[in-house]
A protein has these predicted regions:
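Short, well-ordered alpha-helices that flank and scaffold nucleotide-derived cofactor binding pockets
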Residues: 24-28, 32, 121
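Short, well-ordered alpha-helical microsegments
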Residues: 45-48, 115-119
Length: 132
């Protein structure tokens, strides 16, 4: 199987640290080898802006910002229940709006554990090669 479309996904949409910079550098090198690369994130932010500045295709899943909060903000029982409901409805919304984007990629590279959690059902349904 010849890889033609690679989708990189990272949930840290407003970060440009080591992992995100490495992902952008790898995407640029793959583009030089005529591989179609897209960098996606859970929401628009610095990561997608930097990818666009480097002429890399971008895609935003536009997840609810409340679900993208850090773990310590879900310390109480109410917050944990809210998170579970938000996650469930985000899965449904992502399936309806974004499943096609995942399905058209030959390889899906997940850059962090949060992304894997946020997109777990969709990643399994695509039956595509998933790299973490």
């Amino acid at each position: 199987m010849s890889v033609k479309n690679i989708l990189f996904i990272d949930s840290y949409y407003n970060s440009l640290y080591g992992a995100q910079k490495s992902m952008i550098n790898l995407a640029l090198q793959l583009q030089e080898k005529n591989i179609n690369v897209t960098i996606a994130s859970m929401h628009s932010g610095f990561l997608l802006e930097e990818a666009r500045n480097n002429s890399i295709n971008t895609y935003s899943f536009n997840f609810n910002p409340n679900i993208l909060k850090s773990e310590h903000q879900y310390s109480g029982l109410y917050q944990k229940i809210t998170f579970i409901f938000l996650l469930f409805f985000s899965w449904i919304r992502a399936f309806i709006l974004h499943f096609h984007k995942l399905k058209t990629s030959d390889v899906i590279c997940v850059n962090d554990i949060r992304t894997f959690l946020y997109l777990f059902p969709l990643l399994m349904l695509t039956r595509k090669k998933n790299i973490w």
